[in-house]
């Protein structure tokens, strides 16, 4: 990384990486990250928390959505790249208040911040594939390929 994290997504990625590497509680890691970031708005703090806790909470769901989009086993994808894909997929699946285009764009932009230009096309392709597989609305009952998005709510995959 060239610069310290300044955006909600950069903070979330940094905290998720530290959480994965150290096993420390995400809450403490977030507070440390916020204390080191000047001028972050309340809204961006909230987004960083939502992204961090959401990816941790929904790892199994995110992995299940990502696996069919990638030809190689997850173990052969670099850990930071997989986490970046989880972050993008979380935004597509669970943050209805954010546009899908922005979620993909901002996630792909993280590759630049991470100095990983070679990940750019791969991340864009995988996240666009996830986007194509999402259905238009929510389902009332859980089909075999539905994604739980809340109590009694499911997002139907378009496959």
Residue ranges and their predicted role:
Residues 1-159:
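Class I Rossmann-like S-adenosyl-L-methionine
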């Amino acid at each position: 990384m060239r610069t310290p994290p300044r955006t909600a997504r950069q903070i979330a990625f940094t905290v998720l990486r530290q959480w994965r590497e150290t096993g420390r509680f995400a809450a403490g890691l977030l507070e440390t990250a916020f204390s080191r970031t000047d001028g972050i708005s309340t809204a961006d703090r909230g987004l960083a928390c939502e992204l961090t806790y959401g990816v941790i909470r929904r790892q199994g769901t995110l992995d299940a959505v990502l696996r069919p989009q990638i030809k190689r086993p997850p173990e052969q994808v670099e850990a930071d790249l997989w986490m970046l894909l989880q972050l993008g997929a979380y935004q597509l699946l669970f943050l209805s208040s954010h546009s899908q285009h922005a979620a993909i764009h901002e996630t792909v932009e993280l590759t630049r911040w991470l100095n990983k230009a070679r990940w750019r096309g791969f991340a864009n392709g995988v996240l666009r594939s996830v986007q194509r597989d999402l259905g238009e609305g929510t389902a009332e009952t859980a089909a075999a390929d539905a994604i739980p998005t809340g109590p009694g709510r499911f997002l139907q995959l378009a496959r």
